[in-house]
Structure formats: structure tokens, C-alpha cells
């Protein structure tokens, strides 16, 4: 019973996230957090342009609140909007920017490398950008742009790596763009820190002590 409820909760979370992403795509949707409380459900939206989410006189945020309550059966939803401080280090926003660049006619290498350079300049410890589809020619293939360390599976991937995905709609077909960024404050299990050892030098004392001169009376 608990397992079924866990699965249902995760499915609902994914559906809510997808709905909010589509509703706030033009605001630079960077992800969401959903947490139940004794007073209802707190939903935090991370976006690049908060004003577009709230809407004039708060109309848009009211509409989303009603939809979450009626369509998704979210109990007393309370939406909070937070601005993303560094959009280029948010994988969802970064993947959307790359997708938009491709739709504008950018070459996939230029789009991937431009985004990667921005992340490196912002001191991202690890980045993986993957652009897949008919990026050159008729055959579908994928191109990766990498820097630093990144994890694909296990606990480090779940808790240490943030993920974003977007699609670019081109005449040749759909191009998928995925971005993985290692959190700057996350320490990987294979990271070994070698601390310098402080060696205290022993000074041999042979019993020789300097004595002050004594005067004869």
C-alpha cells in the first residue's frame, strides 16, 4: 500500500512539474519543489523572470493555484516564486536556451560550446550537455559537450547532479537537449582531500642554558 502511494505521489509530482513548466516556459522555468505541510502543499517555483509568473494583479498565479487544486487534487496549494540568481547554472534554463538557439538557426556545436563556456566561466565543477537528433544529415546522432566531473547513476547522481531537458522543434525533426550540472558544494565520494601535515621540529636540549653574569661584591 505504501509503495503504491509512493509511486502515485511521484507520478503526480511529475505531472505537476510538467504543467508548471509549460505554463511558465516564457518566464524561464528553472524547476520546482513541492512539500506537504499541516496547512496544505507548498510549491516553490524557480524562474528567471518572476513577474511573468505572478501576472498582473496576481491573476496568473491565482489561475495556476485553482488548476492545481481542481485538476491535480493538490490540497490547499500555496505557490511561492523565487528568482534564479545565475540562470546559466540552472540546467533547465540552460537547456531551454540551447533549444531556442537551435530553433533560431544556430549550429549545434556553437550552441553547445557557447553554453559550456558560460558555465565554466561561472566555476561549474562538472557539466555534461547532450544534443541529440538529426543535428547533421539524415541520421540521428548525439553530440556531447563535457567539462570536469559528472555522475550518471547512484547516490551522487541523485543528490549531487541537477538535470534539465528541453526540445527544439526544427524542420528536420525534434532535437533533444539535456544538461547535467554538478552542484558546486557537493563532494563526490572519490574526491580525496590531502591536508598538509604540520611537522613540529624537535629542538634537542643538552642541558645548556644561558646564565646571566653574576657580579662580585
From Swiss-Prot:
Keyword Repressor carried by entry: no
TM region positions: none
Keyword entries, A-Z: Ribonucleoprotein, Ribosomal protein, RNA-binding, rRNA-binding
Biological process (GO), any one: translation
Disulfide bonds: none
One cellular component (GO) term of this entry: cytosolic small ribosomal subunit
Protein task: Binds the lower part of the 30S subunit head.
Assembly with partners or alone: Part of the 30S ribosomal subunit.
Protein name: Small ribosomal subunit protein uS3
Protein species of origin: Picrophilus torridus (strain ATCC 700027 / DSM 9790 / JCM 10055 / NBRC 100828 / KAW 2/3)
Protein encoded by which gene: rps3
